[in-house]
Amino acid sequence: MSYPQFGYPYSSTPQFLMTTNSLSTCCESNGRSLSDSAAAASAQTPVYCPVYESRLLATARHELNSAAALGVYGSPYTSTQGYGNYVTYGADAPSFYSLNAFESKDGTGSAHAGIPQTAAYYPYEHTLSQYQYDRYGTMDGSTRRKNATRETTSTLKAWLQEHRKNPYPTKGEKIMLAIITKMTLTQVSTWFANARRRLKKENKMTWPPRNKCSDEKRPYDEEEEEEEDSQKATIKNEKKTVDEEIHREEKALDLSDLEDFDTIESESSECELKQPFHHQPQDGHQLRQRDCVNDHCKEVILKMPITSTATQELDRTKICHKTGLDQCEQDLLRGRQRGGGESKSCFQQQQILDSKPRIWSLAHTATSLNQTEYPSCMLKHQGLSSPSSSSSSSAVSTPVCVIDRRQDSPVTSLRNWVDGVFHDPLFRHSTLNQALTNTTVSWATTKGTLIDSGSLGRSVGNSTNVIKGQLPNLPHDTNKEFIAFQTSGSKMFCS
């Protein structure tokens, strides 16, 4: 009777029938003779005891003990007979053993050969395990190729030829190529890396070099590249626009500085009009004056400046020139018909306008060291004249145009500034101080104040030439003031 369901092919009869004597009695010394041992063995029950190693005996004892504890085996021996659960050798066991080393070695080999193999052992097969793929990623380990052959590389070469512009397969493409070529992912990746290296070495590189990145990542698609280029272009245009705006603002600031500087320097334009020092509003902001006694003389409309902006200053200059020239042309036509002195006076005024006057500058006036270089607007002939002018010629009253109002010269308001900055004795001269104090001048020049250009002379040293503005064709008027114009060279200072 056996129990194959437990994997133990034991029969119902015990394999070991031995006495409960100690194992030491089984192995006795060689001093006893074989006949003595045979006589002792005949007194007991004969036992068949094959030779086992101690390891096998210990295993057998454990298995029998566990089986008896489970109640599978009933103990065939009673306690009166002296048999326990543990198998022991009889007293005369040495009759069955020989202590010869060679015989024991032979017997041990035969004992191993007779042990049957248990049915619970199965040879390991990786296909029956839970993970049906081996570590190389294929179903059958025997079909795995250790080295790439010509057939497998032909497939990879074909794919590389189709993707010469971008020889970087994605993860999915690598898996597909690995299945087709029965290669691993590592082999496919290595092959492509070597192929790219070979093409680069042979200068057959047709793809743009990438930055340092893994082989699993593929470069951007064409659409993504176009979007990236468009974004870069947009950012570049924005930066360019901002730079242009900044440059334009800086240029505007520079131009504004230049305009301010030009406005200061060109305070007096080519026209003989200057901005009034004190603005006094009048009706129509215009002054009308007549040159002659009769009504046949023309009217000259002189626009007085109201604001001090540079743009209006330039406009006033242009209007003044244009108006003066147009009126002179009309007067020339009338003078031909009348043949009087009006054509002559208009022609003389046109000559004065053509000769560009010297720009009257406060800085030049303040820094000039010679008294004769001051313009005539600083000196008033009526009741007061410089010593040089009084010595050279006498004052003669000449009819001039009467102006509706008079403006104070800016030099009188700058007297304190001149006295505070320039401490030269020349500026402290009593005559000059008296002249600066009593100076009053009109800012509007008229056509009637005409000067013969031939009589202009340059004053040298302390001698000055006072130009007489006597007009032959105009009647003498004692109520009019005579203004002495003091010049330097052929260029007239005017205000």
From Swiss-Prot:
InterPro entries: HD, Homeobox_CS, Homeodomain-like_sf, Iroquois_homeo, KN_HD
Keyword presence, Zinc: no
CDD domains, sorted: homeodomain
SMART domains named in the record: HOX, IRO
GO CC terms, sorted: nucleus
GO molecular function, one term: RNA polymerase II cis-regulatory region sequence-specific DNA binding
Pfam family name, one: Homeobox_KN
Region named Disordered: 203-245
DNA-binding interval(s): 141-203
Biological process according to GO: brain development; cell development; dorsal/ventral pattern formation; heart development; neuron differentiation; proximal/distal pattern formation; regulation of transcription by RNA polymerase II
Residue ranges, compositional bias (Basic and acidic residues): 235-245
Entry's localization field: Nucleus
Keywords: Developmental protein, Differentiation, DNA-binding, Homeobox, Neurogenesis, Nucleus, Transcription, Transcription regulation
Role noted for this protein: Acts partially redundantly with other irx members in neural patterning. Required for formation of the posterior forebrain, midbrain, hindbrain, and to a lesser extent, spinal cord. Patterns the neuroectoderm in both the anterior/posterior and dorsal/ventral axes. Does not appear to play a role in pronephros kidney development.
Family that this chain belongs to: Belongs to the TALE/IRO homeobox family.
Protein name: Iroquois-class homeodomain protein irx-4-B
The species this protein was found in: Xenopus laevis (African clawed frog)
Recorded name of the encoding gene: irx4-b
